[in-house]
Amino acid sequence: FIDKGEECAYFSKSTGLCIEVSTSLFSHESKAYGHLNKLFEDVFEKSIKINIDKIDILTLSHEQHLIYIVFHNMKHFLTGGFGIRQVADFSKYIETYGEYINWEKFWSDLKDLNYDTFALNLIEISLKYLGFNDDKITYPDNITSFDELKNSQKYYINSESLINDILDAGVFGASTMDRKHTALMTLDAVEDKKKSNRLKA
């Protein structure tokens, strides 16, 4: 058993199984993404029950789960990158649970934190490269077609640089020492920007 503050991990030496449990979704100390926990303060009130192997468990609501996937990808993007598997997790979650998601709430929550454009670029990558079916999505302003949304030019949707970064990153951005070093500078810049924005307010 390993206790790392906001994360606890169990590691079995005989099987190699590792189970991590986080006591918060994001580190409260992080200036870059600690504020994202605010969106999950009502997580227990909004939790849903699912049944796995005849056992009921509580989990995030479908909107909060998808928002968490977006935030988690951004967290890894800031700390070195994330792989195509994480984009597949995002698109597969939508394909599986999209009909249960309150899309208006989803987009509103993302827009409040300026993550809506990032999510739209993940959708574009999913459509272009992963055979993603977006028929369960209602886009912002009740738009039902991705092409219509992109042509409206209300959002910066140009996923070419992002997909190149994803493919270069490896699983979690640790493909090279240069990436790890650059990630530290990026995270530092984001934290400084958050600090200066708070000082202006």
Language model feature labels by segment:
Residues 1-201:
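Conserved NTP-donor binding/palm subdomain of two-metal-ion nucleotidyltransferases/polymerases, i.e.
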